[in-house]
Amino acid sequence: MPAWLLAVAEPVTEATEGSAEKGILDAILESNLINIAIILSLLYILGRRVVGEALAKRREGILEELRQAEQRKQEAIERLAEEQQKLAQAQQEAERIRKQAEANAEARRQELLQQAEREIERLRANAERDLSAEQEQILQELRRQIVRQALSKVEQELPQHLNEQVHQRLIERGIQMIAR
């Protein structure tokens, strides 16, 4: 029997020795104390094993949860690293696409500028050609009008001042001027 149980039971037995009535009660009390001591001892012995096993299981469960949490943490760190790598690659790809788009835009801008310059040059050449043709046409029309007016005036004044031979030469000159 454990020492603490004997220490509790001893004062109770000393106090009950003086009376006979108390003898029965003391015996019951003593037997109850012994029974309680036995039950407590059994509970301690058996309970220690059960509680120890329960605590060991609980500790194993906690350790397993910690291992799983650590594993999930490592997996999360690995996934994070992978996602960061993917993000970096996506950013590099986006930068490459942006630079390519800028280069394409610049090339297209240069192409459009060159095309516009060629179109301006073509329009300028057409305008100069049209202007030259129009100027030539106007000059020819002016020459014709001048020749007509001159001939008309000469025809009015010439018969009075010239003879037939001079008249014929003037007509030929007028025809030559018109032919130019």
Curated annotation (Swiss-Prot):
CDD domains: ATP-synt_Fo_b. One of its GO terms (molecular function) is proton-transporting ATP synthase activity, rotational mechanism. InterPro entries: ATP_synth_B-like_membr_sf (IPR028987), ATP_synth_b/b'su_bac/chlpt (IPR002146). SUPFAM superfamilies: F1F0 ATP synthase subunit B, membrane domain. The chain crosses the membrane at residues 33-51. It is found in: Cellular thylakoid membrane. One of its GO terms (cellular component) is plasma membrane-derived thylakoid membrane. Its main location: membrane. It is a single-pass membrane protein. HAMAP family: ATP_synth_b_bprime (MF_01398). F-type ATPases have 2 components, F(1) - the catalytic core - and F(0) - the membrane proton channel. F(1) has five subunits: alpha(3), beta(3), gamma(1), delta(1), epsilon(1). F(0) has four main subunits: a(1), b(1), b'(1) and c(10-14). The alpha and beta chains form an alternating ring which encloses part of the gamma chain. F(1) is attached to F(0) by a central stalk formed by the gamma and epsilon chains, while a peripheral stalk is formed by the delta, b and b' chains. F(1)F(0) ATP synthase produces ATP from ADP in the presence of a proton or sodium gradient. F-type ATPases consist of two structural domains, F(1) containing the extramembraneous catalytic core and F(0) containing the membrane proton channel, linked together by a central stalk and a peripheral stalk. During catalysis, ATP synthesis in the catalytic domain of F(1) is coupled via a rotary mechanism of the central stalk subunits to proton translocation. Component of the F(0) channel, it forms part of the peripheral stalk, linking F(1) to F(0). Belongs to the ATPase B chain family. This is ATP synthase subunit b. It comes from Synechococcus sp. (strain JA-3-3Ab). The lineage of its organism: Bacteria, Bacillati, Cyanobacteriota, Cyanophyceae, Synechococcales.
